[in-house]
Amino acid sequence: MSVRKLKPITPGQRFRVVNGFDAITTDKPERSLIAPIKNSGGRNSQGKMTMRYTGGGHKQRYRIIDFKRTKDGIPASVKSIEYDPNRTAFIALLAYADGEKTYIIAQNGLQVGQKVVSGEGSAPEIGNTLPLSKIPLGTVISCIELRPGQGAVIARSAGTFAQLMARDGKYATIKMPSGETRLILLTCSATIGAVSNSDHQLIVSGKAGRTRWLGRRPRTRPVAMNPVDHPMGGGEGRSSGGHPRSRNGIPAKGYRTRSKKNPSNKYIVERRKK
């Protein structure tokens, strides 16, 4: 994986850094695994705006991803590594020995032609999915379940990974991508390896138009609003807006919003560092 810095022949390309897409092997998705996406423009079923600063963008089709990897013991070969417009990570097309095809989140180092398999008897190799009870300590993992059979919910974005630190009783100690240390049931599954496209953080859009292609609209500064719209709005002339706050009045800098009565607090060994 690599990035390309474009020549500054136009103002929009002067600072632009794009993905090299070296790992991508095809630009044609599997037709049986795509579905249409209806653009809501940030409105709900009543037509009321529920999400600001979203709308427009290029038309996309959803790639149906297998986050559960339930075909235990059936080997699959990697047919292609593809770009997915709906996520930052690349995806891999698998062809199972029984003829079924699925998409999975591609791990860093996954190659076309490589064999992957899921289940308890799988080897701890890149792309294989195993229960946490069968993964060696210290292994870099991604696409982790929080509840058995739920499907991957943790470490799915480009370049993210977690690490299996210890096992005690029926729980595994996981160092999360955020830096948090958390307990997860040993019966939950995870995939070996870090998520692909680790250079995603180096990408620079270069111009406002490319951000619009992604469906993101311009964001209004709170200090430019009126007091009725935001706690930081109003004032005579240009003002600092006072203490930084969200639109709901919650302090924005370092204020902890997690409930002290959250039942899952008992599974957090160490909180992330802010």
Curated annotation (Swiss-Prot):
Gene Ontology cellular-component terms listed? large ribosomal subunit
Ribosomal protein found in the keyword field:
yes
Under Pfam families, the record lists:
Ribosomal_L2, Ribosomal_L2_C
Q: Which UniProt keywords apply?
A: Ribonucleoprotein, Ribosomal protein, RNA-binding, rRNA-binding
Q: Which residues form a coiled coil?
A: none
Question: Which segments carry the region annotation Disordered?
Answer: 34-53, 216-274
Q: Which SMART domains match?
A: Ribosomal_L2, Ribosomal_L2_C
Q: Which GO terms describe its molecular function?
A: rRNA binding; structural constituent of ribosome; transferase activity
Chain segments annotated as transmembrane: none
Concerning InterPro entries, the annotation shows: NA-bd_OB-fold, Rib_uL2_dom2, Ribosomal_uL2, Ribosomal_uL2_bac/org-type, Ribosomal_uL2_C, Ribosomal_uL2_dom3, Ribosomal_uL2_RNA-bd_dom, Translation_prot_SH3-like_sf
* GO biological process terms on file: cytoplasmic translation
Q: Which domain of life is it from?
A: Bacteria
Checking Gene3D superfamilies in the record gives: 2.30.30.30, Nucleic acid-binding proteins, Ribosomal protein L2, domain 3
Signal sequence annotation: none
Q: Into which family does the record put it?
A: Belongs to the universal ribosomal protein uL2 family.
* Role noted for this protein: One of the primary rRNA binding proteins. Required for association of the 30S and 50S subunits to form the 70S ribosome, for tRNA binding and peptide bond formation. It has been suggested to have peptidyltransferase activity; this is somewhat controversial. Makes several contacts with the 16S rRNA in the 70S ribosome.
Subunit organization: Part of the 50S ribosomal subunit. Forms a bridge to the 30S subunit in the 70S ribosome.
Please identify the protein, giving its name as recorded. Answer: Large ribosomal subunit protein uL2
Q: Which species is this UniProt entry from?
A: Flavobacterium psychrophilum (strain ATCC 49511 / DSM 21280 / CIP 103535 / JIP02/86)
Lineage from the top down?
Bacteria, Pseudomonadati, Bacteroidota, Flavobacteriia, Flavobacteriales
The record's gene field reads rplB
